[in-house]
């Protein structure tokens, strides 16, 4: 594996944050400097955490996932007041979801290791599984290449019900068949059998989406020391009750803090991402197997336009009786994370970084400071045949990231012809239409009754010219079919569906191609935190 860094243009909050623009950095409580991390440690030492209760729960949960010894030791270390965490989170995608989930975890592991060495304190890596999520459409699929097309392959559970990812039971038989269909789209390699067994071992131990995700991730990172937490685990919810109560008692201040911070963001020229009603409480409650966002209505806490209604006392009582019924929304999830874990740093993707910039005053309302927010490492893998295609087309490795691949293809094709086809046909159509306009005028003067026919004649001539243009383009493309297929392969591999590779393809493809130790070998590479994109040649 060879690793290179390239500068990929970014926009908005992320670009300005990484470029050190003071205006947007003022929306965060810490700069990404070593002094800021030292200050963060001092700030965390002044706070209290329910460490022992958390350790008890995490030991039980990670042991069930068959965690390695390094993970168990890291969980136990959390009981020490001088231990801190680097944390990130993601939904429980089937087969772990897109590659960026793996890259988030690699980011967490690397930053935790670096900060432990530089700060001289124990720093453990934590990955937060968003188990409360009810949106199965975001986690029930993966993308594959089939018949020279990119296809979204959805897992259709035979027993679907509206429940969270932590509670949605998987039909193992159906899921196994779905996985087999996925692997049929991959090339058969020396690793295929082992990877299928690897995945099936995790599936057999699982009852829910979160189980399957947790087992796969733990198995993939078994020696890394990674700690997993299911955000919707009933035992964790019990520990969170005091903070749920605090959010309910301060929901107006939370909403005001969000509104005020979004006004700051607007004044800086950015468009806020988070959209909420002015009366929202920022807490979900599970009612009749549905996740309902609570709102304030004349002092009552209501859901589904008033279908359900609770007084403050009733809501608090229900939190104490059934904490597993409650979960956070996009605004309060970061707050709950801050309440539960002594967070040295939070690692997020571009979207997360943008919406965290809207939360500074929300954190302050609760009496917290935002942790340092570190953009995750971004990675693209270039396989040997794709590197060959790039070379054959005289493209640089950075070209597909800086330019639209379709545009690169069009430019290459136009360079194979002395005169651009589009330009020549535009010119020809213009000349012919000028002649025909004059001809129509001549016809109209002699026989006005033929005017309509003359107009249709113009339309048919134009149709024939466009047909000729299409046929010529098709023949030119056929002549250069070999080279154009290289562009298609480059597009599919590096910019599938016009998106970054890590947002579409799944890690199982790479495990199948390069072996079960693929992720371990990637983790051995030195990644930098300078905002550049990492390209790994395989």
UniProtKB/Swiss-Prot annotation:
Database matches in Pfam families: CC_BshC (PF24850), Rossmann-like_BshC (PF10079)
Enzyme class label: ligase
GO molecular function, one term: ligase activity
EC numbers for this chain: 6.-.-.-
Keyword Ligase tagged: yes
Keyword annotations from UniProtKB, A to Z: Coiled coil, Ligase
InterPro entries linked: Bacillithiol_biosynth_BshC, CC_BshC, Rossmann-like_BshC
Source species, domain of life: Bacteria
Coiled coil (residue ranges): 460-484
Signal peptide: none
Protein's UniProt keywords contain Ligase: yes
Family the entry assigns: Belongs to the BshC family.
NCBIfam families found in the cross-reference section: thiol_BshC
Function: Involved in bacillithiol (BSH) biosynthesis. May catalyze the last step of the pathway, the addition of cysteine to glucosamine malate (GlcN-Mal) to generate BSH.
Stated name of the protein: Putative cysteine ligase BshC
Gene (name only): bshC
């Amino acid at each position: 594996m060879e690793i290179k860094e390239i500068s990929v243009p970014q926009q908005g909050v992320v670009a300005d944050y990484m470029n050190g623009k003071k205006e947007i950095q003022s929306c965060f409580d810490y700069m990404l400097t070593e002094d800021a991390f030292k200050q963060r440690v001092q700030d965390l030492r002044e706070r209290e955490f329910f460490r022992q209760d958390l350790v008890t729960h995490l030991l039980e949960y990670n042991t069930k996932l068959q965690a390695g010894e390094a993970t168990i030791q890291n969980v136990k270390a959390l009981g020490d007041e001088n231990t801190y965490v680097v944390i990130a989170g993601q939904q429980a995608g089937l087969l772990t979801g897109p590659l960026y989930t793996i890259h988030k975890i690699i980011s967490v592991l690397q930053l935790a290791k670096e900060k432990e060495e530089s700060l001289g304190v124990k720093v453990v890596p934590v990955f937060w599984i968003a188990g409360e999520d009810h949106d199965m459409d975001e986690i029930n699929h993966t993308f594959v290449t089939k018949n020279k097309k990119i296809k979204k392959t959805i897992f259709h559970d035979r027993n679907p019900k509206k429940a969270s990812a932590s509670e949605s039971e998987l039909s193992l038989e159906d899921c196994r068949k779905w996985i087999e269909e996925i692997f049929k789209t991959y090339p058969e390699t020396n690793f295929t059998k082992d990877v299928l067994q690897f995945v099936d071992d995790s599936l057999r131990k699982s009852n829910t989406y979160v189980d399957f995700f947790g087992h796969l991730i733990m198995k993939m990172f078994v020696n890394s020391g990674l700690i997993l937490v299911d955000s919707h685990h009933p035992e964790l919810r019990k520990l969170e009750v005091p903070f749920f109560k605090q959010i309910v008692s301060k929901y107006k201040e939370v909403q005001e803090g969000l509104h005020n911070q979004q006004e700051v963001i607007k004044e800086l020229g950015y468009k806020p991402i988070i959209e909420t009603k002015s009366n929202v409480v920022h807490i979900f409650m599970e009612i009749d197997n549905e996740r309902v966002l609570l709102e304030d209505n004349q002092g009552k806490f209501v859901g589904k336009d008033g279908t359900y209604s609770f007084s403050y006392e009733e809501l608090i009582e229900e939190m104490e009786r059934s904490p597993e019924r409650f979960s956070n929304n996009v605004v309060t999830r970061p707050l709950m994370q801050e309440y539960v874990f002594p967070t040295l740093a939070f690692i997020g993707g571009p979207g997360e970084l943008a919406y965290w910039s809207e939360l500074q005053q929300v954190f302050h309302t609760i009496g917290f400071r935002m942790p340092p927010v570190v953009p995750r490492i971004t990675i693209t893998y270039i396989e040997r045949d794709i590197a060959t295609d790039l070379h054959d087309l005289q493209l640089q490795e950075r070209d597909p990231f800086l330019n639209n691949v379709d545009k690169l293809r069009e430019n290459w094709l136009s360079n194979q012809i002395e005169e651009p086809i589009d330009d020549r046909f535009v010119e020809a159509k213009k000349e012919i239409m000028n002649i025909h306009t004059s001809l129509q005028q001549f016809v109209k003067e002699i026989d006005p009754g033929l005017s309509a026919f003359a107009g249709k004649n113009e339309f048919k001539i134009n149709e024939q010219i466009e047909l000729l243009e299409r046929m010529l383009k098709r023949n030119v493309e056929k002549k250069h079919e070999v080279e154009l297929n290289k562009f298609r392969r480059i597009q599919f591999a590096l910019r599938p569906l016009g998106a970054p590779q890590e947002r579409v393809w799944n890690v199982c493809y790479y495990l199948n191609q390069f072996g079960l130790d693929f992720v371990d070998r990637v983790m051995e590479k030195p990644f930098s935190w300078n905002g550049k994109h990492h390209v790994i040649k395989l």
